[in-house]
Regions:
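Small-residue (G/A/S/T)-rich helix-start motifs and N-terminal tracts that mark the onset
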Residues: 1-79, 86, 190-357, 361-386, ...
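Nucleotide and nucleotide-moiety/phosphate-recognizing core
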Residues: 37-127, 133-157, 341-342
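Short strand->helix junction
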Residues: 83, 129-134, 164, 170, ...
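Short acidic loop-to-helix transition motifs that present clustered carboxylates
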Residues: 108-112, 161-165, 188, 360-362
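A short, aliphatic-rich alpha-helical micro-motif
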Residues: 117-121, 147, 174, 321-322, ...
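Internal gly/pro-rich beta-alpha loop/helix module
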Residues: 121-122, 127-220
Length: 537
């Protein structure tokens, strides 16, 4: 897995490297040369390097000099005379590059910038680094617009200019790069929100042999998975299995208003490999729900005249859960006294449990929108997986009016939940543009899914898959956050396959379900044989 560090922790690693004998000037030299090497491997012939006035700009000057030494036609665009740079190190490397023969275009107009870019095949963005946040100022806002209007490929250094490497948010114009060469470690902002579209392919340049050790000691905020990491949690089907040994799933949910959500969740659980799936819904919707499910039995539960579960359903739900390997509660269930009672009863049982959608909203009501004040509810021996999107997560931790808006905040809120009881088998699958599967010991980030997943019902499908994989592990996953990440990865690839069939805009949640099995085969195959996995998964 690849570590993800907050910006402050990256700075601490840099301090550790200097104490280990790697000077700041040497780090800048290595960073610039690492970028130059990536540019050379792209086959660049004519390169324009945009340099800012800080150390990120210094990396650009080093890169330009390295490219010139390899015979590349290179030019630097700088806001001021290199001799006027205030930072000693940036000024020194800029002066060195100029002495070596790197031409510099100082304080150009928009027209001059556009003219310079006309014949360039590659642009290197070194305007604003990881310390940037807020609004981009002139001239960099103009330069960013020029870069984004160019047909040349774009390589960003550390972070695309205009993007916060910590939050992943861009308040104004932001460079849209084809590749980002980031130093030392991945940062949260590169992986989520605006960073998803801005960074392109991300390459990590470690800069020193001591980096790996120092990064681990810095306690990464999260870990980004590679396919081979899933080997420990993949449950390979065998010819000796029967439907019972493959695990059984109970899905509880639905209402007269939302009968479709539990249907999708139950079908997804079956497609994800569970040997037996049972769907429990309000009595009033059993006939129409059963008509959509040939392979999945439907059980009726007590409900009111509006087709919402009543408190009397709780006892029956727990009894059903005791006979299944894992239970999912929530899809389409509504928020009322009866559903709240069902969620409460299941939390107090020993059933391996996935809580999604209105199950989470019932949990928020049960805990008065502050789950951290009710540790007894999540303190259980059996696994508990919560799958909130950002708004649902906000409701759980007292931030209903101020839900998390970034991966950074998402991780903080999820940790508030999992640390509530001091340690248990709980995992929060915090869903967003970048999903994090947060356990007590670590947060695991799967490869993010495609834009096609942004459709109603996609979360119901994921929840059904979560329950299915938990059931196949018989509620005893050795690494529950990693298992949850595997499910997210399969879900994402199912979205990719669906988009190939229907187009990104045309995918509906039901299209994902019938591709779950194929997606799982591909992901699991490449987990065992990771070579070339990136070409397909």
């Amino acid at each position: 897995m690849q570590p993800v560090l907050n910006i402050d922790d990256v700075k601490r690693v840099e301090v550790g490297l200097t104490r280990a004998g790697v000077s700041v000037s040497e780090l800048m030299h290595r960073a610039g040369c690492a970028v130059a090497q990536e540019v050379l491997e792209l086959g660049a012939k004519k390169v324009v390097v945009f340099c800012g006035m800080g150390n990120n700009g210094g990396d650009g000057w080093v890169c330009a000099e390295a490219l010139l030494s390899r015979g590349v036609d290179v030019q630097v665009v700088t806001p001021i005379d290199p001799d006027q740079l205030s930072g000693d190190l940036a000024r020194q490397v800029a002066q060195s590059a100029v002495r070596a023969g790197v031409p510099a275009l100082e304080g150009p107009s928009r027209e001059e910038v556009l003219e310079t870019l006309d014949e360039a095949d590659t642009i290197v963005d070194c305007m604003l680094g990881t310390g940037f946040h807020g609004t981009v100022r002139t001239p960099f806002d103009i330069w960013i617009e020029c870069v984004n209007s160019s047909d040349a490929r774009v390589v960003a250094v550390d972070v695309p200019s205009g993007l916060s490497a910590q939050s992943g948010l861009a308040e104004g114009p932001c460079v849209i790069a084809d590749m980002t060469v980031t130093m030392i470690s991945l940062k949260p902002g590169l992986l989520a929100d605006a960073g998803r579209d801005a960074c392109g392919v991300i390459v990590v340049a470690p800069l020193a042999e001591q980096t790996e050790r120092l990064v681990v000691e810095a306690d990464p905020v999260a870990w980004r998975t590679d396919l081979a990491d899933y080997l420990d949690v993949v449950c390979e089907p065998t010819a000796a299995q029967d439907k019972f040994s493959r695990g059984s799933v109970l899905v509880v949910g639905g209402s007269s208003r939302f009968p479709g959500a539990p249907i999708m969740a139950a079908r997804a659980a079956a497609r994800a490999g569970a040997g037996y799936v049972t769907l429990a819904v309000p009595n009033t919707i059993v006939p129409p729900v059963q008509s959509h499910l040939l392979e999945i039995p439907v059980v009726g539960l007590p409900c009111d005249v509006e087709g919402v579960l009543t408190a009397e359903a709780a006892e029956k739900v727990v009894a059903l859960a005791e006979h299944n390997s894992a239970t999912l509660i929530g899809p389409g269930m509504r928020v009322a006294g009866g559903p709240v009672a069902c969620v409460n009863a299941l939390l107090r049982s020993e059933a391996p449990l996935v809580v999604d959608a209105d199950g989470l909203n019932c949990l928020a009501r049960l805990t008065e929108n502050n789950i951290t004040e009710f540790p007894e509810l999540t303190r259980r021996e059996a696994p508990l997986v919560l799958t909130p999107h950002r708004r649902e997560l906000g409701r759980l931790v007292g931030r209903a009016d101020n839900p998390p808006v970034s991966l950074e905040e998402q991780l903080e809120c999820a940790r508030d939940v999992v640390w509530t009881d001091g340690g248990s088998g709980i995992v929060v699958v915090a869903k967003a543009s970048a999903t994090a599967c947060v356990g007590v010991d670590q947060a695991v980030m799967p490869k993010p899914g495609p834009a096609a997943l942004a459709t109603a019902g996609s979360g119901d499908v994921l929840a059904g898959m979560m329950a299915s994989y938990l059931a196949q592990a018989h509620g005893e996953a050795s690494d529950l956050p990693l298992l949850c990440a595997l499910v997210c990865e399969v879900h994402g690839y199912a979205g990719t396959l669906a988009a190939e069939a229907f187009g990104t805009r045309g995918v509906m949640a039901g299209d994902l379900i019938d591709r779950i099995g194929l997606a799982a085969d591909v992901i699991e195959e490449h987990a065992f044989v990771p070579e070339g996995a990136g070409e397909q998964a």
